[in-house]
UniProtKB/Swiss-Prot annotation:
PANTHER family: 30S RIBOSOMAL PROTEIN S2 PROKARYOTIC AND ORGANELLAR (PTHR12534), SMALL RIBOSOMAL SUBUNIT PROTEIN US2M (PTHR12534:SF0). The keyword Glycoprotein does not apply. This is Small ribosomal subunit protein uS2. HAMAP family: Ribosomal_uS2_B. NCBIfam families: rpsB_bact. Coiled coil: none annotated. It comes from the Bacteria. One of its GO terms (molecular function) is structural constituent of ribosome. The gene is rpsB. GO terms for biological process: translation. Keywords: Ribonucleoprotein, Ribosomal protein.
Amino acid sequence: MSVTMREMLEAGVHFGHQTRFWNPKMAPFIFGHRNRIHIVNLEKTMGMYQEAMKYIRQLSSNRGTVLFVGTKRQARETIAAEAQRAGMPYVDQRWLGGMLTNFKTIKTSIKRLKEMEASIEDGSVQKLSKKEALMFEREKIKLEKSIGGIKDMGGIPDAIFVVDVGYHKGAITEAAKLGIPVIGVVDTNHSPEGVTYVIPGNDDSSKAIMLYARGVADAILEGRANATNDLVESIKGGDDFVEVSEQA
């Protein structure tokens, strides 16, 4: 589902930060300022947004994984919901250092969480004492909060989508070290450096965040649907009947 300029305006994508907090590296994407607030050039945002969505569709059609990252209060619920809708992993609470660069250690925690979930399913947790059960529950809640969104990721993602790159410098740095492409919403007070696909725009408005996250989820679903359609067509194309004549 494509996003229109009107939708971007209504979501407040064009509203940047106060002019005194600006990052000069965002100058090419700034239209001007009003009441000491920088105004983002939506014509540039639209083009760059479309380029990012094109990349995500292509990645998804090749069964790529996109990790959604948004831990600010106004982004958490949206990031989790849209990532789940697209069947993708997400980080909505806190970025743990080494989440990408030290994934081997993170996998140990994921294994522990899955073991705990299995204990609940098979009822073995019922055998714990009251004190043990309380400790079990506390540990499970803590693990769910920190890695619940990535427990089915399986490995390093093919790309990460980040809302507010300044707030998630750790994620950007780790992605850069591993050569993982970053699709990032960059407001006027942050640097676009380290972001492969820059989406210049408001990173504080919940409406704007919903627009970005919904767009990424839609692009993933479209890419997956296109891949399925291509597969069906290729199977149909291979069903042509060929008569083989018997040799005497």
